[in-house]
Structures are given as C-alpha cells and as structure tokens.
C-alpha cells in the first residue's frame, strides 16, 4: 500500500514539474474548503497529500489540490507537523482542562485521533525531528520580545524541557509555524519591522540560531518528501490565501481558496522554485449571484459579470467582477467598487455597468445599515403590511475601464432621497439619458416603475421623476385593496421592429417571476402595457445581453429564495418584435 501511495505521488509530481525544474503551484478547488474557520494556521505534508490546519480542524488535500477528507477540532487548532505517518497539532483550549491551557494532539493519516497531551500554556507552532516533538509557547502576546520559548517532548509525550530561543530580532506572539528538514528546525514568527513575518533556523538542541532565512510562512509551511519532489536540496512549500483578507472568507462571494508555492533551501536561504499559473476556473453553480449583470466586452473577447458584496464580505460593501470566455467557467472575483464609509452601506443591490460616451458607469443601489439614518416615512395610508424602510437609493459611479475601479460620480442618490427606491437602470432616448427605477412597495404599498431624466454628464437628475406604471396593473395581481405589489429589476430593450420593451420582476403564485411590458408609443413615457409573464419558476431580476457571436440572452438569478442558493441562470431569447420569448 505504501509503495502504491509513493507511486501515485510520483505521478502527481511529474504533472506538477515544469520543464525548467520548477514546480507548478497547487491550487485548492473553490468551494471545497468552505468549512474553514478563520484562516489557515499551519501545514504539513506526506506522500499522500497536504494537511492544512485551521481554527476548527484539518483539511487533507491531494497534491492535485482536491479535498480528500477533513476533521473537526472542538478547540482552537494552530500549527501542525508531520512525521512517521502521524500529524501532530498544537491546540489552544478555549476553556482550561484541569488547569491546562494547551494540548498536543496526534492524528493518523486518515485524521483519526490516536493520542493527546495536555500542557499548561497556550501553544502554537509544531514540528517533529527524529523522536522529538517541538512546540511553541506564547507567554508574551504582542509585547515586544527578542526570543521565543520552544517546548520539547518525546513521541510518547515525556517532557524534555523548555528552551528560551533567540531569533535575532524583535517579535511578538510566540512561534506561529514550524517545519523541519530532518536535521534543523525552522520557525516562522511575526516580527516588528519589515518584513512582518520572519523565519529562524535552529539546530535540534535550540541553542544555536543558524540564520534567519527570508520566507513568508505565517499560514504554514512544511518540507516536501523526496518521494514527491526529488531534489539535491530540501524543498518546502508555503500556504498562501487567495483573493484578499483570509479572515473574511465568504462561501458564496469570496470562497476560500489556497495556493501552495514551493521553495528550495540552499546556501542558507530559501529560493523560490514556483511556476505560478492561474487558479482553476469555477462554474456559475459555484458562487452565489443576486441581480447578476453581464457585460459583453468585445474588445477583450470575454464576458464580465458584476455582483453585489456586503459590509460583512472580505472587501466590504461594493461590487465585484468575474470574467469568462464561455459564460460557464468564471474567474475568481476582483473588487471593482467599494462604497465610501460615509454612506453607511450594508449591501449593494443590482449593480449595472454601462458604457456611455467613452466612460463606464456603474448604477448601484445602496441599502444603508440599520439605524444609520432615520427610517423613511410611509407614503400610502391604510391597513397593509408594513416592514422596515431604511434609506435606499441608486448612486452612479464612474471608471475609465470596465475593470474599474469605479469611484463615486453622483453626489447623492439619483431618485429623491426621501423615497425608498432600488434597481436603477440606464436608458438613452432621443439623445437624452434617463434612469428607470423602482419606487418600493415598502413605502407606497403598490410598487411603481418610475423614470427620471439625467443631466448629460450623468451626475444628477435633470427633472422630476415620472411614473410609468404600477405593479398592480399586471393581470395576475391580487385585487385586495390592502395587497402589496412588488416592482423589481427593470431592464429596457429596443426590439428589431422598433418596439420599446421592458423586462421586470414581481411575484406570482409560483414565487418570483419575469414580465415583459411594451410601451404603446415606443417612448419611455408610455403608456405601458399589457404585462406578459414569460418566466415563473422562482427566478427574476432580468437583464439582456448579446453574446460575442450575437445571440440574445437573458440573465436572471434563480431561485429567489433562500438567499444563499441564488445562482445565475442564462437563457437564450427570441426577439419577436412586440414581445420577447425564451428560446426553448
């Protein structure tokens, strides 16, 4: 069995080895590490794969980056080390056990617990050389200190004493990560100054510091077995969190993804031997999407999807963008808009990106944080269901490129600030720019579709808003005088015969749905009607785009509930002149 595992590792090594002797980066698969708690604390490896520790447990991934198995830890798990078919982990207990605050725990390669030892202090950093377990102690916290305490014990948990080590520089906390090359111990720690993370190399007796090679290894590193990547010199890997602040992973908008980089230790320093490729693409089913907006970038020959982010996400409230060449596989997100803190934004809704007069404009609805501003008044009296009415409206942002960054362009929400509004979209008629938006049912009971002309520079409204129609005018609306009616997600389209059509959403018996409505005059002022339901499978907030090859498509999110299950659905469409049809 062992020979089979070594053979499998060798095959993987061949696939990862670049022609010039470097090693291609290993990427984990988006979505497979969604159970991570906090960030990666430590790492170790064997011929079977790589072990990544986090506050809540361990992930075991193959050398191809795919998740093999995982286990949980009911305490805060820090760094881990590997030796002789065992994984050794340093744990900090949330509640002391018999007065003990720390623990060394041991797992087999299938992540079954096979032993543990309580310790009096908080521990982090863990490695094994020969028959000795090394672990870091942290009696300092952020207090500056020159050395760190490192404890030792035998494999059967006999205490071998604690040594005060001198790392050669000011640091804070204790040793964060450890690795061993079979002869020496390498300790990663947070230092004061630049760089913020350093590494120190010690002889096994810890009395002599043999150098401070430069390596950023705060999220774990380990030596690679010769069976995986044969080399004259020891080779190590480091863990790198992709896509921003690893303390704010979000399974849908910022899924955890890790990249392993590779280093060779020779002449007292770590030398980068990594060939960094591109992360694997993910499909539309792998990330949450509410109110998706797709822009066809013909110059770049790709598609850009713009999606909301919240104040709890990694980058805060704003808009992120992904790219695709086939509308199925998408890149990791990049943040293209961050809402200024003064707006007190909890989340951005319905971001739309439009090219206009050589610039790129983002229409984004800002929903403010609870209690940040006085609640908006009810404008429709009566005994109908009323819910919270936070300040909400559509702002305009501008950039020189569809890649952003988008910065605030309008000084205030384009619709009246005392209205509860959302989902502003862009339309140009007879050379004049307009915003079409929804006046929310939460304030007026019967949601309205409203338009307002914009100034030529799109900085503000150029006139008074005018109503287009109300949600209650759709044929399947409830006749009850106290019923509420939703308007949502308008998008305007000029058909092949010159008809002006609007796609929009409301509710129906089967949930969320899509309507198409025609202007009887072909003008924005209408009148508008009738309203034809063309999709009723709990999906909506429609928009239209054409593929690079010219095919008309509709993008919606489906389902509408629950929130975390929303995904982008793309449907081919038929332009029928006076209406639109899904091409089934």
Which stretches of residues belong to each language-model region?
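Positively charged n-region of N-terminal signal peptides that target proteins for export
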Residues: 1-4
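Hydrophobic h-region of N-terminal signal peptides that target proteins for export
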Residues: 8-17
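A short helix->beta-strand "capping" segment at the edge of beta-propeller domains
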Residues: 19-36, 273-286
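Surface-exposed loop/turn elements that mediate protein-protein interactions on large endomembrane-trafficking
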Residues: 20-29, 58-72, 103-115, 149-166, ...
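Catalytic phosphate/metal-binding cores of nucleic-acid and nucleotide-processing enzymes, i.e., regions
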Residues: 38-39, 44, 51-57, 88-90, ...
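Short beta-strand elements that form the blades of beta-propeller/WD-repeat-like
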Residues: 48-53, 86-97, 132-142, 183-191, ...
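Carbohydrate-active catalytic/glycan-binding domains of CAZyme proteins
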Residues: 75, 170-175, 182-184, 195-196, ...
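Hydrophobic, aromatic-enriched interface-forming segments
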Residues: 123-181, 433-455
């Amino acid at each position: 069995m062992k020979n089979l595992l070594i053979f499998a590792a060798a095959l993987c090594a061949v696939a990862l080895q670049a022609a010039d002797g470097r090693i291609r980066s290993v990427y984990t698969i988006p979505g497979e590490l969604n159970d991570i708690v906090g960030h990666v604390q430590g790492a170790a490896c064997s011929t079977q794969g790589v072990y990544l520790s986090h506050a809540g447990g361990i992930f075991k991934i193959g050398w191809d980056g795919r998740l093999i198995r995982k286990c949980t830890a009911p305490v805060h798990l820090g760094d881990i080390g590997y030796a002789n078919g065992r994984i050794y982990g340093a744990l900090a207990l949330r509640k002391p056990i018999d007065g003990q605050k720390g623990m060394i725990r041991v797992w087999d390669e299938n992540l079954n617990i096979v032993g543990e030892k309580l310790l009096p202090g908080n521990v982090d950093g863990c490695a094994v050389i020969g028959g000795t377990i090394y672990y870091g102690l942290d009696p300092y916290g952020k207090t500056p200190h020159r050395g760190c305490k490192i404890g030792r014990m035998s494999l059967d948990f006999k205490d071998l004493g604690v040594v005060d080590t001198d790392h050669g520089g000011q640091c804070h906390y204790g040793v964060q990560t450890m690795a061993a090359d079979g002869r020496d111990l390498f300790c990663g720690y947070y230092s004061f100054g630049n760089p913020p993370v350093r590494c120190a190399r010690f002889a096994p007796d810890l009395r002599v510091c043999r150098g401070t090679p430069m390596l950023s290894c705060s999220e774990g590193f380990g030596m690679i077995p010769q069976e995986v990547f044969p080399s004259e010199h020891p080779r190590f890997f480091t863990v790198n969190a992709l896509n921003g602040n690893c303390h704010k992973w979000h399974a849908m908008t910022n899924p955890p993804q890790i990249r392993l980089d590779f280093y060779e230790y020779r002449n007292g320093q770590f030398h980068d031997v990594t060939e960094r490729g591109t992360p694997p693409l993910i499909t539309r089913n792998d990330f949450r999407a509410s109110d998706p907006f797709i822009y066809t970038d013909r110059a770049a020959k790709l598609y850009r999807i713009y999606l909301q982010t919240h104040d709890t996400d990694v980058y805060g409230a704003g808009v992120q963008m992904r790219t695709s060449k086939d509308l199925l596989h998408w890149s990791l997100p990049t943040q293209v808009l961050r809402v200024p803190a003064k707006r007190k934004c909890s989340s951005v809704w319905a971001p739309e990106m439009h090219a206009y007069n050589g610039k790129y404009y983002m229409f984004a609805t800002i929903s403010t944080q609870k209690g940040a501003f006085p609640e908006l008044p009810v404008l429709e009296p009566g005994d109908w269901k009323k819910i919270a009415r936070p300040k909400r409206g559509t702002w305009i942002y501008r950039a020189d490129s569809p890649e952003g960054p988008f910065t605030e362009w309008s000084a205030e929400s384009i619709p009246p600030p005392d209205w509860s509004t959302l989902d502003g979209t862009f339309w140009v008629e007879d050379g004049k720019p307009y915003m079409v938006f929804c006046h929310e049912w939460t304030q007026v009971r019967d949601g309205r579709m409203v338009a307002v002309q914009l100034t030529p520079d799109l900085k503000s409204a150029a006139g008074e808003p005018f109503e287009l129609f109300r949600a209650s005018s759709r044929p399947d609306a409830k006749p009850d005088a106290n019923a509420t009616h939703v308007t949502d997600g308008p998008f305007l389209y000029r058909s092949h015969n010159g008809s002006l059509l609007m796609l929009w959403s409301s509710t129906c018996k089967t949930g969320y749905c899509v309507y198409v409505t025609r202007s009887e005059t072909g003008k924005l002022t209408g009148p508008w009607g009738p309203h034809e339901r063309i999709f009723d499978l709990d999906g909506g907030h429609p928009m239209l785009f054409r593929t690079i090859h010219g095919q008309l498509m509709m993008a919606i999110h489906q389902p509408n509930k629950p929130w975390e299950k929303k995904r982008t659905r793309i449907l081919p469409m038929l332009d029928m002149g006076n209406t639109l049809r899904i091409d089934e």
